Amino acid sequence: MSSLASKQGPRYRHTADSSEPYETIGVEKLTPIIGAEISGVDIGKLVSDEARSNRQMDEIHRALAENLVIFFRDQHITPQQHLAFGRKFGELHIHPAAPHEGDDPALMKIYADKDSPRANGEGWHSDVSCDLEPPMGSILYIRQCPPSGGDTLFANMYAAYEALSERMKSYLDGLTALHDGEQIYRGLYANYGVADPPAYPRAEHPVVRTHPVTGKKALYVNNGFTRHIIGIPRDESDAILNYLYKHAENPLFQCRFRWSENAIAFWDNRCAQHRALWDYWPHTRAGTRVTVKGERPV
């Protein structure tokens, strides 16, 4: 894995945003490149108080755009409040495979204990990128944590793209790749009694997408769902994708979030990847996730 360093200094040099100060929330960056903890927000009250909501929501939108993933601690919310918070960002996405909690299929169940055959999201990915219109964001609420471990890592795909050479950027711009959920999802949730549909989503997306809000370019391939680049021989595709996967996993682009009970993470799937660590067996980690619909990548 490259350090992106040279005798002339780092190949990738992050320039911090010169933003105006926030008025209704506190924003403490985890790293200069990705991630921030948000304070001064009570999400339970936010979803029920329109007077409070509008200004804070504007600043939460801004914090997400600037930091790609934001975290809220000590949030004691109900399932209905979790769903309502997600709906403030758009229509909710229904996962094509995962079990849900309660009556609303938009409330995805997140659970792993000593008897689980697997845990959600152990490899680097962008959520459900196999959909024709992949989700724009995911909001994960963890109610129960193991004594240690269970961290989630996030990586900045703007930075991953920007750190590529100009020749590589020129080559990738305009290419598309197939994202397919079949290998990932079929049989994945059999332990919950989930029956597989006849087919899972698959779609072609740009290898480099442009974020609809920020206008920035982001690398949009991931080891979980991307199968091959369209229009080139498979061996070339494999070599390029394997390079891009390793490049995107460089720690320089990452932050690592240590969970506490009743914490929330909200990440932008259009410009960030993530992976969960299952290093806490035989302990339990439990929560729910709400996912917001997105647009077709361009």
Task: Name every feature range the model reports, one short phrase each.
Residues 2-264, 269-298:
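Non-heme Fe(II) oxygenase catalytic core, chiefly the N-lobe of the double-stranded beta-helix
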